[in-house]
From Swiss-Prot:
<dbReference type="GO" id="GO:0006284">
    <property type="term" value="P:base-excision repair"/>
</dbReference>
<feature type="compositionally biased region" description="Basic and acidic residues">
    <location>
        <begin position="920"/>
        <end position="930"/>
    </location>
</feature>
<dbReference type="GO" id="GO:0006508">
    <property type="term" value="P:proteolysis"/>
</dbReference>
<dbReference type="GO" id="GO:0035520">
    <property type="term" value="P:monoubiquitinated protein deubiquitination"/>
</dbReference>
<dbReference type="GO" id="GO:0005737">
    <property type="term" value="C:cytoplasm"/>
</dbReference>
<dbReference type="InterPro" id="IPR050164">
    <property type="entry name" value="Peptidase_C19"/>
</dbReference>
<feature type="region of interest" description="Disordered">
    <location>
        <begin position="114"/>
        <end position="139"/>
    </location>
</feature>
<feature type="active site" description="Proton acceptor">
    <location>
        <position position="488"/>
    </location>
</feature>
<dbReference type="InterPro" id="IPR001394">
    <property type="entry name" value="Peptidase_C19_UCH"/>
</dbReference>
<dbReference type="Pfam" id="PF19718">
    <property type="entry name" value="USP47_C"/>
</dbReference>
<dbReference type="Pfam" id="PF00443">
    <property type="entry name" value="UCH"/>
</dbReference>
<feature type="compositionally biased region" description="Basic and acidic residues">
    <location>
        <begin position="977"/>
        <end position="986"/>
    </location>
</feature>
<dbReference type="InterPro" id="IPR045578">
    <property type="entry name" value="USP47_C"/>
</dbReference>
<feature type="region of interest" description="Disordered">
    <location>
        <begin position="863"/>
        <end position="1004"/>
    </location>
</feature>
<keyword id="KW-0788">Thiol protease</keyword>
<feature type="compositionally biased region" description="Acidic residues">
    <location>
        <begin position="987"/>
        <end position="1000"/>
    </location>
</feature>
<feature type="domain" description="USP">
    <location>
        <begin position="174"/>
        <end position="549"/>
    </location>
</feature>
Length: 1354
């Protein structure tokens, strides 16, 4: 809510209307006359006439009466065809059908296809700030008696309509649109505009376009803005052109700054732009004053001084260290010039006395500017809470201010003065500079922006001092509402034209009174202001502007006829541009905008565009526009196209427009609307065809012909029918379109997903069967016996059920490198294409599977193999006769998937051979030990692979296993003895870990054998990810599980399903791994993209872990080693055992199991040491698990969780260097023990030892120039877990030193060289630690335009 405005208008109640029933009317404006959809609520007596209702709506909506219609909106399905309320008969609302005590919904619509006429033709741009009160509901009638939101003004407009929101305020002034947080800019611009002297000078300046770009010219854009503020008929205008001339981009609009800060920066920019022009000294002439900064010796009377200039005077609200604020601005001014005594340690060195003496230091005003600017310093720093605060104390200020008491009139008479070159004054330094100082300075009498004048002219100063007129008149109060964290600025400005005060609050301009000015004094007294309760007391004056009362100098605002010629030309140019915008808005207001669709006659793809056509264009002309818009010129002739009414959501053709080619679009579409409930379709035909007539009431039916023999469903054929038709009539209609016999035709309606209904009652109507606007039916006509079966048992139903659940997926396969090929091919094979000899050798060994399985089971005591398939051929790709499953041969090899699985597993279990060793990048988590017997299978190895479907006999022949073998039952004897002979199952999915599912003998997930439709074929082109990748187009039943889907892909990928991962690709090309094997593909949809990546898929309870090596004394202490797989329930020692061969083969680290440790990794910090007996189930693990591996020089010292491992590093100040890290293990958290441990490893006497905790991330690096002073040495604590140490976990860094060792002294040159080296070192390692909070972005105006913005940055 803005001051002086209220969108809820409440007229006085009629006294005798209390007992009369009232009618609540809610009117929704559905026209497109306005940029917003207005909603008006009227609470009228039931005896009100319909004619009066029209009058009330026209008054409140801002339309001319009689140019719009009101229609019922209570659930009307087709509003356009309903008759409007007739206002001519003298009927009351009750007689017209309005119900008292209920909501009566009405729609305000176009009348006879013509839009309503606005009551005011003078319309401006819509408020782009999003704060327009017109978006609120307007209410007429009695409201509950609640206290309304208070305004800062007693003035409330009684003629408030929509047109007034867009037209110029009745105050005669134009507002400024708030871009986002530019209210501080708006308040200053309005103040400058309302300053006659500034406006007149700006108008006198003439822009030379040949010399400068108008876009980057600040004076020109200000000139344009002022011209628009004076001559525009809009309610508010934009400031984007001005901010663009500042060199600001759109992000600057979201930065809030102080208005006083902006004033200084803008004045500096104008001075730079106005150099060598008539306005070069304008800012100084209007706003600059002078004061004297002096120091006077109290013993000899000698005074040294210098002259400063100022553009504004900063006044402290509350003195530093005081709890009491100044009550008035006069008190603050007196405090500003009140001298302070320099005594004690602050004595002043007097040049005459040649010694330090007591002195008096202060400021004296010598000359006040014509326009006096006073800043009330309401922002301060609270040293108790260490936060910036706003002081909301009450401070009064007069309407007229006499500044004569504050001028030093006796200064020129003082003989004992000296220039500002005095050394004492230089040592003290001026408290005023042209650089911005910190608002949190302890010297609150000091401010920013007062600049030093080194070449002062004494004669001019004496002349200015002699001027007696020092009476100023207040004309601008810039107000801040909010807190130190942020708020809102607006300006209260007194017009010199009529003496009336106005509130300029962004786009809102309203009249206010002197009482409203008093409310800006601050404090908690008085009525609430602009903000409600939360900021009621925080609305107060922040910046004041006074003008000298001098009739000889006081200027008046220029009238239009007094404008200079170049301003008149600018006014004419802006008015023409505004008229052009107005005409464009009028065109927009009469333009129908709809979605346009068209099925391309050649490409057969649905195209979509946006059709914009004037309401007076005919249908024939609209077809020509649509024809060009869809780029069909040269593709199809214009006479083979037409526009029809279309419902894209239901894919339904509602009606065609025969014999209406000469009707206007406004008439056919029901007028111009902001949105339509329908679309348009550009329908095409062949030259030998005739357009079909579409009439309202028809329903669209898409007919799919099913062929049971080929099990195919043909593309749809569109048929239009009537809901009153019977099923037998509907079949006859279909037979004409698809050439099927109606007697044997079966028609199945799909009402919704998976809802198939056989239409077999001949005399039942389509309406009774549940047909709607758009329908989908399947038809089949054959003489097969399938017709006699129950529908749900028939082949037709199964085929349709499969069709409804089949989705199409694009699957990108991994590229097989030579290393990868060795993992899936025969021994020593380096080619990804497997030889046919090898394939036949595999198939030849299938017969002996039972015997070899029995032999292998005897050797593996801890295994229990579950075999569910007789014969053991392992062919998971074959199905029983009659199944819906269809498998396409792999493009990689022609063998079946079972053979591929066997080949892959044979190679994985073949005897170890130097020529067949895994390379680091090709190794899985399984490993074959060379010292094991080749005639048996090590259970430990199999347990880590989880992928073996093949065993090997002593002759190294491959032994294919039945796919029913659950590889998870092959477990390590040390972990799963309790499960010996039992099959492990993983029924429940667990977040962030792998899952598994049970398979039946055909390789399918149990209970889903009937949902195994799978068809894959090579694909190239659209849908494939990346160039060169092999891609499949897969049609699959989405009810199968991910596990079954992966099994079907095995033959195409070339490895077992446990050795590759499935990633789902989203629109933004983000990939997420699908790991829940027992979940179906129901979350996938048509044309989804899938990427297959090689790598062992996780099982339930398993987690992928990134292993990093901790190198404490290296420049980069964190080095990635490898990815490993840990599982819950595994001990730390077991994981170390599994890591040993991986570290040796992949990383070249030959470690002893007792000479390295694992520890927690948090970002780059080493944490808790994992002891060997720890179980990972007790640790907090997730999908992004990272662990440090730390090599040890000796056996592990950490034996218990009660111990604490710390890193210590000695600082040697005499050498400016740090020793390497040394680890100490604490038995307790005692500081005394820490001291003792450090003394033991350093030989420093206990009484000379000092220590400090490192800062930042490990290794807590710090510059050797800073460590001696910046760290908190020798904290006074007794335990490590107390402040400021807070050490309670392993891995903390402790620096220590010998306090008797003195810091080496460096020359300036040595220090600079060392500083450069340290800076370079810390930047390379990335361990530079800074603790400065986020700084506010400085307000800058870039004089060279946006292009040079970056170079202007500090």
């Amino acid at each position: 809510m803005r001051p002086g405005e209220e969108s809820h208008l409440v007229p006085k109640e009629i006294e005798n209307a209390a007992d009369e029933p009232r009618v609540l009317c809610i009117v929704q404006d559905t026209t497109s006359c306005k940029n917003i959809n207005e909603r008006i609520t009227l609470n009228l007596p039931a005896s009100t006439s319909v004619k009066q209702l029209y009058e009330d709506v026209s008054s409140k909506a801002g339309y001319v009466s009689g140019t719009f219609s009101l229609m019922w909106g209570n659930g009307a399905s087709n509003m356009v065809d309903m008759a409007a309320l007739d206002p001519t008969p003298d009927r009351t609302l009750q007689e017209a059908g309005f119900e008292a005590g209920k909501k009566n919904f009405l729609h305000l619509t176009d009348k006879n296809g013509e839009q309503p006429q606005l009551a005011s033709d003078e319309s401006g741009t819509a408020d782009s700030s999003g704060l327009d009160d017109s978006t609120q509901e307007k209410f007429i009638g009695p409201l509950p008696r609640e206290e309304s939101v208070a305004c800062t003004s007693d003035y409330v407009s009684q003629n408030y309509s929509y047109s007034s929101l867009l037209s110029k305020s009745d105050t005669g002034y134009v507002g400024l649109v708030n871009q986002a947080m530019t209210c501080y800019l708006n308040s200053l611009l309005q103040t400058l505009f309302m300053t006659p002297e500034f406006r007149n000078a700006l108008y006198k300046w003439e822009f030379e376009e040949s010399e400068e770009d108008p876009v980057s010219s600040i004076p020109y854009q200000l000139q344009r803005l002022f011209v628009l503020l004076q001559t525009s008929k809009k309610r508010a205008i934009e400031t984007t052109d001005v901010t663009r001339s500042f060199g600001w981009d759109s992000s600057e609009a979201w930065q809030q700054h102080d208005v006083q800060e902006l004033c200084r920066v803008m004045f500096d920019a104008l001075e730079q732009k106005w150099k060598q022009t008539e306005q070069a000294d304008l800012i100084n002439q209007l706003y600059q004053g002078k004061l004297k900064d002096y120091v006077k010796c109290l013993e000899c009377g000698y005074e040294s001084w210098r002259i400063d200039t100022f553009l504004d005077i900063p006044l402290v609200i509350r003195p530093f260290g005081s709890n009491t604020a100044f009550g008035s601005m006069e008190e603050a001014l007196q405090a500003f010039i009140q001298p302070e005594t320099l005594d004690g340690p602050n004595q002043y060195f007097c040049e005459r006395c040649k010694r330090k003496c007591d002195a008096r230091k202060g400021l004296k005003f010598l000359h006040f500017p014509y326009l006096l600017t006073l800043q009330l310093k309401r922002f301060d720093f609270d040293y108790t809470s260490m936060h910036r605060i706003k002081l909301n104390d009450r401070m009064t200020f007069p309407d007229e201010l006499d500044m004569s008491p504050f001028i030093d009139v006796e200064d020129e008479k003082s003989p004992q003065t000296d220039s500002c070159t005095d050394s004492g004054a230089e040592n003290e330094g001026s408290c005023h500079s042209d650089q911005m100082s910190n608002d949190f300075s302890t010297d609150d009498a000091v401010d920013e922006g007062i600049c030093l004048e080194t070449n002062s002219n004494i004669e001019k100063l004496n002349k200015s001092v002699s001027e007696k007129n020092s009476l100023y008149e207040l004309f601008s109060v810039m107000v801040h509402s909010g807190s130190a964290a942020g708020g809102h600025y607006y300006a209260c400005i007194k017009s010199f034209a009529d003496g009336q005060w106005y509130s300029f609050n962004d786009q809102h301009v309203s009249r206010i009174t002197q009482e409203d000015i008093k409310k800006t004094y601050g404090g908690s007294t008085g009525n609430r202001g602009y903000y409600s309760s939360a900021f009621a007391s925080s609305t107060n004056a922040y910046m004041l502007m006074y003008r000298l009362k001098n009739p000889a100098r006081n200027a008046k605002f220029p009238e239009a006829i007094e404008f200079p010629e170049h301003i008149k030309l600018l006014v004419q140019k802006e008015q023409e541009q505004e008229e052009q915008e107005k005409r464009q808005r009028e065109i927009e207001r009469n333009t129908c905008k709809l979605k346009l669709f068209c099925m391309h006659p050649v490409k057969q793809i649905m195209m979509e565009s946006k059709l914009e056509v004037h309401k007076d264009k005919t249908m024939k002309e609209a077809v020509e526009i649509a024809h060009k818009l869809m780029d069909l010129e040269g593709v199809i002739s214009l006479d083979c196209c037409r526009l029809v009414k279309y419902d894209e959501f239901h894919d339904y053709l509602e009606r065609s427009y025969e014999d209406e080619e000469d009707r206007t679009m406004g008439y056919l579409l029901g007028g111009v609307k902001s949105s339509y409930m329908f679309d348009l379709l550009l329908e095409t035909k062949r030259s030998d065809q005739v357009f079909q007539s579409y009439k309202p009431g028809e329903v669209m039916v898409k007919v799919y012909v099913v062929d049971l023999k080929t099990e195919t469903v043909a593309p749809p054929v569109s048929v239009r029918a009537y809901l009153s038709q019977t099923i037998i009539e509907f079949k006859q209609l279909i037979s004409k379109s698809v050439d099927l016999l109606p007697d044997t035709m079966r028609v199945v309606l799909e009402r919704c997903y998976n809802d198939l209904r056989l239409l077999n009652v001949a005399n039942k109507t389509l309406k009774a069967e549940g047909f709607f606007r758009s329908n989908k039916v399947f038809v089949e006509s054959s003489d097969s016996l399938d017709y006699q079966l129950v529908f749900t048992d028939s082949h037709l139903w199964k085929l349709l059920d499969r069709h409804a659940n089949t989705i199409r997926l694009y699957v990108s396969l991994p590229e097989h490198t030579p290393q990868t090929a060795r993992s899936v091919g025969p021994k020593g094979g380096g080619d990804s294409n497997l030889s046919e000899d090898y394939c036949s050798r595999v198939k030849g060994n299938v017969k002996s599977v039972d015997a070899i399985l029995e032999e292998s089971t005897e050797k593996l005591k801890s295994l229990s193999l579950q075999q569910h398939q007789d014969g053991g051929n392992g062919d998971s790709s074959k199905s029983t006769e009659g199944s819906d499953f269809e498998n396409i041969d792999s493009p990689l090899n022609e063998a079946d998937s079972g053979s591929a699985d066997n080949r892959e597993l044979e190679n994985r279990i073949l005897p170890a051979d130097p020529e067949n060793n895994f390379q680091p990048e090709e190794r899985s988590d399984s490993d074959v030990n060379n010292d094991r017997s080749t005639s048996s299978v090590d259970s430990d190895i199999l347990s880590s692979s989880h992928s073996s479907d093949t065993l090997c006999n002593a002759d190294s022949a491959p032994i294919p296993l039945a796919n029913g073998l659950d590889s998870h039952s092959i477990t390590s004897s040390r972990r799963s003895k309790a499960n010996d002979g039992k099959k492990e199952t993983w029924d429940t999915a667990e977040e962030d870990s792998g899952t598994d599912s049970e398979y039946d003998e055909s390789g399918k997930s149990r209970g889903e054998a009937q949902y195994m439709y799978f068809k894959a074929e090579p694909h190239a082109g659209e849908g494939c990810l990346g160039e060169g990748n092999k891609c499949l187009l897969v049609s699959v039943d989405k009810r199968i599980t991910l596990a079954a889907f992966k099994q079907q892909l095995e033959s195409f990928v070339g490895v077992s399903s446990s050795q590759f991962k499935v990633f789902r690709v989203y629109a933004s090309n983000q990939e997420f791994e699908s790991v829940r094997l027992n979940e179906t593909l129901s979350s996938f949809s048509d044309d989804n993209k899938i990427t297959i990546r090689l790598g062992r898929a996780l099982k339930k309870g398993e987690y992928r872990v990134k292993i990093f090596q901790l190198l404490v004394n290296e420049p980069e202490p964190c080095k990635f080693l490898l990815d490993a797989v840990f599982s819950k329930g595994m001990t730390v020692r077991q994981s170390k055992e599994e890591l040993l061969p991986l570290l040796r083969d992949q990383c070249g680290l030959d470690l002893s199991i007792d000479r390295f440790r694992l520890r927690k990794k948090t970002w780059k910090n080493p944490g808790t040491v994992f002891l060997d007996y720890h179980v990972y189930e007790n640790e907090s693990i997730s999908s992004s698990w990272e662990v440090f591996l730390e090599a040890l020089d000796e056996t592990e010292k950490m034996k218990s969780m009660s111990q604490l491992s710390l890193f210590t590093k000695r600082w040697r100040p005499s050498e400016l260097k740090l020793d390497p890290f040394k680890e100490i293990v604490m038995e307790s958290n005692s500081v005394d023990e820490l001291r003792d441990k450090i003394c033991d490893i350093s030989a420093i006497p206990l009484e000379n030892l000092e220590f400090a905790k490192g800062r930042g991330t490990f290794p807590c690096d710090i510059s050797v120039l800073e460590i001696h002073q910046d760290l908190d040495w020798n904290p006074k604590v007794s335990t490590l877990n107390a402040w400021p140490l807070y050490i309670s976990d392993d891995g903390a860094v402790i620096f220590y030193r010998d306090k008797m060792e003195e810091l080496v002294e460096l020359t300036d040159e040595q220090r600079n060289d060392l500083a450069k080296k340290e800076s370079s070192r810390l930047q390379k390692t990335g361990h530079r630690v800074t603790y400065s909070p986020r700084k506010e972005k400085a307000l800058k105006i870039y004089l060279d335009g946006p292009s040079n913005k970056d170079s202007s940055q500090d």
